[in-house]
């Protein structure tokens, strides 16, 4: 259930589900047909469409921020935000140097592949012989420091790319070891920790699973436990580079290097795979440069440069990439098929080239959000200031579901798309807890554009990402501070 207003008419409240649209202003069905799936979160469903069978409902219940108060313009938080930005200029300068280094290595990869306009032609049908697709794979492999890569619009998400790698490599009797605590929520059903029986999880295919808990207190990898963690049946060790929805630091490349060494010392046959979502271009190298065998990610996150309309990638040793592609397509087809139209293919090239810059701006925006929210008395991870490793996700502990709703609503209202929609926590595929999402983005789910989301569970943390320029967060944070002040 969401509330929203149309900019074309006087303000009015609309409550709706997939079964009803109710206009509280005049009790009639409104001509603005905004709808959603049952129990789904705002930005994960269709907003516009023909109305279904109409039935008027009472106002929904749920988690909503308190009613807005009139804000005295003299109390605007803008001055505080700009003061934080001024103090962060040395940090921003460091990030600019990171951007420059990553632009250089990306351009070298493009030059090595000799990219020209003929690579943007695209393909149809089976997609056999697509020169552009093959060249893009070469660039991604180079950027990731890997032997091979597959960049495909056919991956529907980062979770899908990771799942293809897991199912491509693991066989009945093998064990998957999650090295840095539990993985991201959406992988739990892939693994079989929860979910609908009969969905074909790894567990249902006879693959074992074990979690290595994080070290108490620090939230870091438990190096002592990892030193003896590999068993004869352990076939893959999975490292999640970002914090995801966990209360822990981002893994550094040095963490990944050390983990590879510790794991391989016990068994060289273990495949070390890295969930690289939100990790691309946050350092001057990628997991392949420190010995990882595989890494996977989403094109609507960092490496798509906010331009790519969908897709994901797998990069690693050639036989492992081939195994993942056999899962994406079919054995015997693998990398030889997968049509993509020319316009989308050009955006995949252009987005990858833009990614160092857009990721750097997101890092700056995260540092600004951390400084402002820490100054307002909230706990943040990473803490304000320069951080190593750089993190594309800034976690802000708000302390209550109402504060999460207020924060998300302020972000959504400050966004270019769907600013009239108030996000409400709801059930979203892949997540065990209700999740609130605010990402009024041009590409659905492209949190690299700018977004904030989080599961409704203690300590009620919202996770901020993206921003094509850091000043977008100046505008957003002004709304956020105002909204949170109105809850007091």
What role is predicted for each listed range?
Residues 1-8, 16:
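N-terminal chloroplast transit peptides
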Residues 374-488:
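Conserved C-terminal alpha-helix-loop-beta "cap" of PLP-dependent enzymes
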């Amino acid at each position: 259930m969401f509330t929203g207003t149309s900019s074309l008419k006087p303000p009015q409240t609309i409550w709706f589900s997939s079964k009803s649209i109710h206009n509280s202003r005049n009790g009639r069905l409104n001509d603005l047909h905004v709808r959603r799936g049952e129990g789904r979160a705002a930005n994960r469903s269709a907003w516009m469409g023909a109305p279904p069978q109409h039935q008027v409902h009472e106002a929904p219940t749920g988690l909503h921020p308190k009613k807005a108060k009139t804000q005295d313009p003299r109390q605007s938080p803008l001055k505080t935000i700009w003061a934080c930005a001024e103090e962060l200029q040395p940090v921003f300068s460091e990030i600019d140097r990171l951007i420059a280094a990553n632009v250089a290595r990306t351009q070298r990869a493009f030059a090595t592949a000799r990219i020209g306009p003929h690579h943007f032609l695209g393909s149809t049908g089976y997609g056999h012989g697509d020169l552009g697709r093959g060249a893009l794979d070469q660039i991604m492999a180079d950027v990731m420091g890997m032997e091979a890569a597959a960049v495909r619009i056919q991956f529907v998400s980062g979770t899908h790319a990771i799942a293809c790698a897991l199912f491509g490599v693991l066989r009945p009797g093998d064990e998957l070891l999650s090295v840095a605590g539990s993985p991201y929520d959406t992988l739990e059903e892939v693994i079989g920790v929860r979910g609908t029986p009969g969905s074909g999880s790894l567990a249902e295919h006879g693959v074992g699973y074990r979690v290595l808990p994080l070290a108490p207190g620090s939230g870091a990898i438990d190096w002592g436990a990892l030193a003896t963690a590999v068993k004869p049946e352990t076939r893959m060790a999975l490292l999640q580079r970002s914090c995801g929805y966990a209360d822990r630091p981002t893994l550094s490349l040095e963490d990944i290097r050390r983990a590879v060494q510790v794991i391989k010392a016990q068994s060289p046959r273990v495949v070390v795979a890295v969930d690289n979502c939100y990790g691309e271009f946050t350092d001057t190298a990628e997991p392949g440069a420190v010995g990882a065998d595989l890494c996977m990610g989403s094109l609507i996150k960092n490496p798509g440069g906010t331009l790519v309309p969908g897709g994901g990638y797998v990069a690693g040793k050639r036989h492992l990439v081939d195994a993942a592609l056999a899962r994406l397509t079919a054995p015997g087809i693998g990398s030889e098929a997968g049509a993509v139209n020319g316009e989308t293919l050009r955006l995949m090239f252009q987005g990858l080239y833009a990614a160092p810059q857009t990721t750097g701006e997101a890092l700056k925006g995260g540092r600004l959000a951390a400084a402002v929210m820490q100054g307002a008395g909230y706990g943040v991870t990473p803490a304000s200031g320069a951080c190593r490793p750089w993190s594309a996700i800034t976690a802000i502990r708000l302390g209550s579901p109402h504060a999460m709703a207020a924060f998300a609503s302020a972000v959504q209202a400050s966004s270019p798309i769907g600013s009239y929609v108030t996000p409400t926590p709801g059930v979203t595929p892949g997540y065990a807890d209700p999740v609130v999402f605010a990402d009024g983005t041009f590409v659905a789910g492209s949190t690299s554009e700018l977004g904030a989301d989080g599961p409704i569970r203690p300590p009620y943390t919202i996770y901020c990402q993206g921003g094509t320029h850091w000043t977008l967060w100046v505008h957003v944070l002004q709304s956020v501070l105002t909204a949170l002040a109105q809850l007091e």
